Amino acid sequence: MPATQLLLLACLVWGLGARTAQLRKANDRSGRCQYTFSVASPNESSCPEQGQAMSAIQDLQRDSSAQRADLESTKARLRSLESLVHQLTLDEAAGPSATQEGLQRELGALRREREQLESQNRELEASYSNLLRDKSALEEEKRRLREENEDLARRLDSSSQEVARLRRGQCPQARGTPQDVPSGSREVSKWNVETVNFQELKSELTEVPASRILKESPSGHPRSEEGDPGCGELVWVGEPLTLRRAETITGKYGVWMRDPKPAYPYTQETTWRIDTVGTDIRQVFEYDLSSQFLQGYPSKVHVLPRPLESTGAVVYWGSLYFQGAESRTVIRYELNTETVKAEKEIPGAGYHGQFPYSWGGYTDIDLAVDETGLWVIYSTQEAKGAIVLSKLNPESLELERTWETNIRKQSVANAFIICGRLYTVSSYSAPDATINFAYDTGTGRSRALTVPFKNRYKYSSMVDYNPLEKKLFAWDNFNMVTYDLRLSEM
């Protein structure tokens, strides 16, 4: 029993210290020895009753609950404080990094903005440079146009003086005689009859010239709505002036034109051009200004509702007149509204290679314009290949009057009409060709001519007369050229 002894010894020592402890020893009912240890209360003089004890216990429990609640509240506040301290610690640790990241983002945005500003600055500098170049080009163009204007003024003055001399009778008049047939026609034996040169040279022998020129009155010709338009007989063709050159192979043959009676919104300066190499010719290039035409910058491209044939098209009173592909139909296409206004078959006209000019190219139907109006040049089986002329109504395309010549169409290279007279070109490739025949619709007579005509580029596929400018327009082997003319007094 060492433990019991130690316990009793401790209690005894504690009792001695307190001087109020009592130890009793007695046997219980079963005979077992019991030790009872009593200690006097330091505060209570007597023991409370049972009810008072319970009340005291409850008070103690309440105090304990309150203390426990205070303890839990304190613990909660401590946890909150610990959380706040932890968050503050994290913020302090992450603060410099976040600030640095924000500064880097701001710096990146500023750099991007600077790059955009620099790019805009470069674009502005490039635009300014382009404007300076355009200004220089415009100044150069202005200078060139001024020089051209001065040259035109000089030529106009020279032409006026020439007209004055002609009116005074200082220029010898052309005489039509049998000797007007070119000397080259008497040298046919020098050529191989199978060569192209011989075929072209034959054109100079096809027509028998009249023995003399008959002086016709103006009343014998189709009348112009403007009265006397300054008509006369062709006596001289100048050197070709090259305006521009086609860019692609489709421009080896072609037709270009200006409207001698322009209708709004077009002007005398508006130019149209068609490249005619190909099987589906529909594009018509339109140039509002002469400078655009010279530089090759069209202001509009028309796409025709049906393809055209060859180089016989013309523009007159705001409409494009052309031959429909592989047909004898002439079509009037109004350029401003881009609509077909009229179609008309030319009775009996050959087409698609039946009666072309000597160079070929399906030039069976050739439209022309002069001071008196719209014409069509063609041939028929009944005419046995001779050139037939018909005056057309420009609105309805009805044939108003027809003339049949005795000039074989396939023996000449091209034809045009001035003041009601048909003129033909002897060769499309010879550098020194001639205007070799003239047919007068006023008298129904024809005669031979020897007016020199230059094929500078040796392949003239189109020759037309512009009555407003009094010039020939031609397409010579990719090149668009003009010729000045001189007409005698009627």
Swiss-Prot record:
Palmitoylated. Undergoes a calcium-dependent proteolytic cleavage at Arg-212 by CAPN2 in the endoplasmic reticulum. The result is the production of two fragments, one of 35 kDa containing the C-terminal olfactomedin-like domain, and another of 20 kDa containing the N-terminal leucine zipper-like domain. One of its GO terms (cellular component) is cytoplasmic vesicle. One of its GO terms (molecular function) is metal ion binding. InterPro entries: Olfac-like_dom (IPR003112), Olfactomedin-like_domain (IPR050605). One of its GO terms (biological process) is signal transduction. Residues 1-18 form the signal peptide. The keyword Oxidoreductase does not apply. A motif (Microbody targeting signal) lies at residues 488-490. Residues 146-188 are annotated as: Disordered. Its main location: secreted. The record marks R212, I213 as: Cleavage. Residues 230-489 form the Olfactomedin-like domain. Disulfide bonds join C231-C419. Pfam families: OLF (PF02191). Residues 52-169 form a coiled coil. Keywords: Calcium, Cell projection, Cilium, Coiled coil, Cytoplasmic vesicle, Disulfide bond, Endoplasmic reticulum, Extracellular matrix, Glycoprotein, Golgi apparatus, Lipoprotein, Membrane, Metal-binding, Mitochondrion, Mitochondrion inner membrane, Mitochondrion outer membrane, Palmitate, Secreted, Signal. Ca(2+) binds at D366, N414, A415, V463, D464. Expressed in optic nerve head, ciliary body and retina. It is found in: Secreted; Golgi apparatus; Cytoplasmic vesicle; Secreted, Extracellular space. Homodimer (via N-terminus). Can also form higher oligomers. Interacts with OLFM3, FN1, NRCAM, GLDN and NFASC. Interacts (via N-terminus) with MYL2. Interacts with SFRP1, FRZB, FZD7, FZD10, FZD1 and WIF1; regulates Wnt signaling. Interacts with SNTA1; regulates muscle hypertrophy. Interacts with ERBB2 and ERBB3; activates ERBB2-ERBB3 signaling pathway. Interacts with SNCG; affects its secretion and its aggregation. Secreted glycoprotein regulating the activation of different signaling pathways in adjacent cells to control different processes including cell adhesion, cell-matrix adhesion, cytoskeleton organization and cell migration. Promotes substrate adhesion, spreading and formation of focal contacts. Negatively regulates cell-matrix adhesion and stress fiber assembly through Rho protein signal transduction. Modulates the organization of actin cytoskeleton by stimulating the formation of stress fibers through interactions with components of Wnt signaling pathways. This is Myocilin. It comes from Felis catus. The gene is MYOC.
